[in-house]
Amino acid sequence: MILLKQADVYAPEHLGIKDVLVCGGKIEAVGDNLEGGTGCQVIDAKGMRLTPGLIDRHVHVTGGGGEGSFHTRTPQVELSSILKAGITTVLGLLGTDDMSRSVENLLAKVKALKEEGITAYALCGAYGYPPVTLTGSVKKDIAFVDEIMGLKLALSDHRAPNISVDELIRLGSDVRTAGMIGGKPGFIVLHMGSGKKKLGPVFEALAETDIPVKTFQPTHMSRNHELYLDGLKLAKMGGYIDITCEDFVNGEPVIGHDPMPALLEEAKAADVPMDHITFSSDGQGSWSSYDEAGMLKEIGVTDVGNMYAQMCSLVTRGGFDFAEALTY
């Protein structure tokens, strides 16, 4: 039993100065002048902010990369890195490499993180097609494997499998149905590149079918402004989009400025429902840049701590209210 006294509590709405009683790993009470029982650990939290753990929906928990050959494969994430970033829930996924990495390995890491005390989920699939799976079936992976929430796929990227709209529709239908059977959200996380089609295939699939728009959830949506505008259109249709956080070092954006506040303000100006926009770290994945011929120029490892730094930057640089910054 733990009693935190006089914390400035966000849930994520601002509740003000409160006491919080935790028993058996669960919050049992939030209130004023709470008392703990015999053996209760009391923590003086005066002057501290107490928030829910962050949810990072894009973490390469087993590592990513590999686009510059085998020595550029990135290492798996460590629990300590996740916790230092204030993250208590992760969605683990694969990336470009679905040959030297597997759903089996991903699922084992996700289970290990759960055993270590955080909440962890996974996606089957990677960039490629047909999707890599545990059971041999996307539908069975989602319906029967507790940790698997949906599918990963790449679109509009030079590393994407360039599937047809009909194939995208089939995957959307399978994921939708499997999610219903398994009692899960059932969604496809779409790695978006800088390709000229942008979200065109998704809009075609939605126009031709009755698949719910929330089934297709694109990420890396700030890759260029044209793609972001497509994302705002999707969000206004009821879909969800995810923006990858900038890289930060010691709390400072590597590129010298933080574009996230302007992106979010643009969404507000366009009357986009802001609860349909998230941001994530892409932690332990690789950041990379390519020349005009498609040759790799640079590659590095993305820090899972970028999400916490991004949230802080929204407040300190963007002037966002802390309670709002927590919601993304």
Description of each model-found segment:
Residues 96-108, 116-212, 225:
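Buried, small/hydrophobic-residue-enriched core segments of structured protein domains
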Residues 269-328:
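His/Asp/Glu-enriched, well-ordered alpha-helical/loop segment
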Residues 36-48, 137-142, 260-273:
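Short amphipathic alpha-helices and their capping/turn segments at secondary-structure boundaries
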Residues 159, 167, 173-288, 296-297:
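Active-site core of metal-dependent hydrolases
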Residues 82, 110-113, 231-234, 267, ...:
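Generic structural signal for hydrophobic
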Residues 1-2, 9-51:
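Histidine-rich, glycine-flanked metal-binding segment
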Residues 45-108:
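Metal-associated gating/positioning segment near the N- to mid-region
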Residues 7, 20, 25, 47, ...:
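Divalent metal-coordination and catalytic microenvironments
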